[in-house]
Amino acid sequence: MLQQLNKCLFVAIALIGTHSFASAIINIEDLRQEGEVGLFQSISGSLDASRGNRDRDFYTFTYRIDNNSEGVDSFLVVSQSERKYTGNIIDESNFFHGRVVFKNESKLHYELFVQRSENPFRNYRKREVAGLGFRYLINDHARLGMAFINEDEEDLNMVNTKTDRLNIYFHDDFEVGENIYFNTTIYVQPSIDDFRDDVKSSAIFALDFEVNEQVTISLQYSRFNDNAPPLNADRMDESISTKFSWNF
């Protein structure tokens, strides 16, 4: 067991210096305390740095708090990312997500959520989302969700766009080895008015190594697609990151 964890730590440390092609997608499903009752908190972060001809730093810090009762689950996620070049801040982004889940004795639960992000990494100034939907428990490790969301997005040129979308997501977190889990989260968000040509989607694949009950190391690959991106933005970007999480 100890030998296996040492191998996991070696791989994670080796990947800390992996270049991030874009800011990593925040995985809302990650570290959910579903099925547990009580107050839970977690802190996670990642760092990419290089020194030499060009000094560069890129960090992400995320705080999460869950407050679960017998009938209601609620959680809040706050994240901050920053890029520095030769000591000067060239980009920074922030993310906020709050969600309330109303549980019952069936496998179908209802949820309300709000989200706000400012992310120049993807060429938009801000994006605000409010949604109402349901969450279906497929089995003990897989979930399927659907919601109606209202999106208010403003690009870097201060052009504002409001869109009504469907939000469809699938999440699976299954054990592939002792204390090792493969985490998959997929989101598809088509516009209700333009179902074919205006679609946002993202996929997050992570290998989670549970060092102990409090510490988790995640190796994550994420990909984001937007069929109708903001002006001068690419339709697709990717990121590779190593994340360390502490639960308390």
Give the role of each language-model region:
Residues 39, 70-76, 106-110, 140-144, ...:
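Repeated loop/turn-to-beta-strand initiation elements of outer-membrane beta-barrel proteins
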Residues 39-41, 57-63, 94-98, 128-132, ...:
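Hydrophobic, lipid-facing positions within transmembrane beta-strands of outer-membrane proteins
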Residues 207-210, 236-248:
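Outer-membrane beta-barrel "beta-signal"
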Residues 49-57, 85-91, 118-126, 156-162, ...:
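Solvent-exposed loop/turn segments connecting transmembrane beta-strands
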Residues 47-49, 65-69, 102, 136, ...:
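Residue-level signature of outer-membrane beta-barrel architecture
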Residues 1-37, 248:
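Cleavable N-terminal export/targeting peptides
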Residues 47-51, 69, 80-84, 114-120, ...:
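Transmembrane beta-strands of outer-membrane beta-barrel pores
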